[in-house]
Amino acid sequence: MFIDKAKVFIKSGKGGDGAISFRREKYVPLGGPNGGDGGDGGDIILQVDTGITTLLDFKYKKKFIAEDGENGGASKCYGRAGQDLIIKVPMGTIIREEESNKVIVDLSKKGQEFVLVRGGRGGKGNTKFATATRQAPHYAEPGMPGEELSIVLELKLLADVGLLGFPNVGKSTLLSMTTKATPKIANYHFTTLKPNLGVVAIDGIEPFVMADIPGIIEGAAEGVGLGIQFLKHIERTRLLVHIVDISGIEGREPFEDFVKINEELKKYSVKLWDRPQIVVANKSDLLYDDEVFEEFERKVKELGFAKVYKMSAATRDGVDEVIKEAARMLKEIPVKELEISEDEMYIPEEKRFTYVIDIEKDDEYNTYVISGTFVDRLLSAVNIHDADSLRYFHKVLKNKGIMNELREMGIEDGDVVRLNDFEFEYLL
């Protein structure tokens, strides 16, 4: 089964909590703090694996969570860092942020790695909070939470040449004749339902990758059939081989087919429409009158194309000429990275974890309510039953400007300040 799009949820590991611990040994009455730091959470890393050709694995697994860091321990023991989670993807995978649909990274190189989300930092143990005036801190820092992200993986095949044309014009036959690929071939429409890749390796030319794209029909750019899914797979090709059934045995007019396909390309992407094309009139062995080819060639040249190649993939007549021309043109066409504008790029916030502080006044009870991620993190680090810890708590509120903001809001002596389930009276 060929899967070229998948949605998954990823989360890096949480940092381990710092430890609150004190040295307790015989004959050491004032051992002091010795709580160790927590370990960092595991990252999630994307890695290109050339042995994978589809996103099938992501059909069955939708959630990826890295390992949390271990908590710190006594005797200044540091927690073990969480193990990184490596997710292997096919070459040519584009990663998008689901909500905005913006591109995070284009994984188009062999062995390429990208750290998608970083693990939370481990919290500091109480050893790190000891000072000359605060020698026995009864608090430690909790680990930072892991980062969460919902992403879309989108596979776009990496091929030098894309075979383009209506269904049943001979694209798969040409691929099978010139590579070791074994696409399904039959005399009916949409025999090919997934892209096929093959390496063209013929004496005298430099090898290149050719892709057989499932047949495109009128309205493909608007999604008729599986049009958009098929069209996106030729976005990365440097050269298009546009194959037309010149025999007309199915009742279609060859030149009309040629024009319709190019119109679909233009609707989907002007850049794709402007890509170099080799025009091939296939099934020439079934042609009853050479004037049909000559008329087709004349009309195509009027559109600005230099040459039309007459070919019969079934008898291999003219195949080598087409392949050699493709190899020659590829030497002149530079390899380009996928162009992504700034507007299309997903730029994460500089601070992956931001402190949110929200202060509201409840006039009925003269209570000031402080909430947000900052409060959750601060309270998890403070021992409210320890005087030294409460002094640290007050210092943090002051340094963060919260006490000044409370005064600006009109707080008075005796008013209540609430942080989650913890309350205290404000004293001037």
Curated annotation (Swiss-Prot):
GTP binds at residues 165-172, 190-194, 212-215, 282-285, 312-314. CDD domains: Obg (cd01898). Residues 159-331 form the OBG-type G domain. Its EC number is 3.6.5.-. Keywords: Cytoplasm, GTP-binding, Hydrolase, Magnesium, Metal-binding, Nucleotide-binding. Its cofactor is Mg(2+). One of its GO terms (molecular function) is GTPase activity. One of its GO terms (cellular component) is cytoplasm. Residues 345-428 form the OCT domain. Residues 1-158 form the Obg domain. The keyword Transmembrane helix does not apply. It is found in: Cytoplasm. GO terms for biological process: ribosome biogenesis. Mg(2+) binds at residues 172, 192. It is an enzyme of class 3 (hydrolase). NCBIfam families: Obg_CgtA, Obg_CgtA_exten, PRK12296.1, PRK12297.1, PRK12299.1, small_GTP. An essential GTPase which binds GTP, GDP and possibly (p)ppGpp with moderate affinity, with high nucleotide exchange rates and a fairly low GTP hydrolysis rate. Plays a role in control of the cell cycle, stress response, ribosome biogenesis and in those bacteria that undergo differentiation, in morphogenesis control. Belongs to the TRAFAC class OBG-HflX-like GTPase superfamily. OBG GTPase family. Monomer. This is GTPase Obg. The lineage of its organism: Bacteria, Bacillati, Bacillota, Clostridia, Eubacteriales. The gene is obg.
